[in-house]
């Protein structure tokens, strides 16, 4: 047993910090900066983006985008949490933010680790390409991955080597009527639809 945990000076961390949901130091920095935040959260199924303004009574949501919208509103047939979906969700959120008068934000990636290739950076890249200013530095974006070319190449290789595994791994794509090898062209189609919609 850890004796320090029972000592008189032991301080229990806030519940959301214990649950791995909130970094209160980062939260404090955002609050005192008074800057609009571009909040990115990625779950096992979806990509969620919110543009929020700090307010003493609680955050004020200015705009948001959810990757589930890609399928419902724009006909996206791929996964809702892969790299292309992350970029598209960020792009959609960026357009909506600009539409509501937001031109610049700071990135809030929560407890996501800012490692090379992390999908949160593809979300941010999407918003930047939509016209939103987000100071982020070098985020090591690979343009091929934005369109899902890495997925298409893997699918093509797997299809020739193990058709059963191909059908299993890409069952959702196939059920929706998309051959994963065609993901890059499908990505371009959906991106154009988002651009045409204006957010």
Swiss-Prot record:
- Any GO BP: translation
Give a Gene Ontology cellular component term annotated to this protein: cytosolic large ribosomal subunit
Which keywords describe this protein according to UniProt? Answer: Ribonucleoprotein, Ribosomal protein, RNA-binding, rRNA-binding
Is Cell membrane found in the keyword set? no
Q: Which InterPro entries match?
A: Rbsml_uL18_euk
- Keyword Metal-binding found: no
Enumerate the HAMAP family for this protein: Ribosomal_uL18_A
Function description: This is one of the proteins that bind and probably mediate the attachment of the 5S RNA into the large ribosomal subunit, where it forms part of the central protuberance.
How it assembles, according to the record, is: Part of the 50S ribosomal subunit. Contacts the 5S and 23S rRNAs.
Name by which UniProt lists this protein: Large ribosomal subunit protein uL18
Organism of this sequence: Saccharolobus solfataricus (strain ATCC 35092 / DSM 1617 / JCM 11322 / P2)
Recorded name of the encoding gene: rpl18
